Amino acid sequence: GNAADLDRKALGRIVFSDPDQRRWLEALIHPVVRERFQHELAELRDEPVVVLMIPLLFEAGLDVLCSEIWLVDCTPKQQLERMIQRDGLTKNEAQDRLQAQWPIARKRDRADCVIDNSGGVNDLLAAVNRCGLRADGTTW
């Protein structure tokens, strides 16, 4: 890439190790992200269901855009291992990112449905299907 390309890994190291830098970046980015989601949702307003996948939903204050919140959950050990594997982070970098997030218990309390992703794919699909069941027996 060229000099204008964003080095996401370097930026992540900076903002997740320094709370002041993270707050500064969030103050710049979160309003732009919110505006983008509001625009996308307006375009999709006639759809019966719209799914948003937002890693920092509560932290960014984007939960107000949602009529229902499903939280995908796993053990802290799995969360750390998955971040290291998926994002190529060191253990310390992954821990810094987790420390920057709300505690999972706080997120669980605000979720309408918690999807346990600590097992296999079939367990995950069953958990998603349980969240999709409505009180009247219909699904999404």
Model-predicted segments: where are they?
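Short beta->alpha linker loops
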Residues: 6, 28-29, 74-75, 99-102, ...
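Residue-level recognition of specific faces of alpha-helices
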Residues: 14, 21-24, 50-53, 68, ...
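Generic leucine side-chain signal with a strong bias for well-ordered alpha-helical environments
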Residues: 6, 11, 52, 56-57, ...
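ATP-dependent small-molecule kinase phosphotransfer cores
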Residues: 1-48
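ATP-dependent NMP and nucleoside kinases share a basic, alpha-helical "lid"
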Residues: 34-44, 49-85
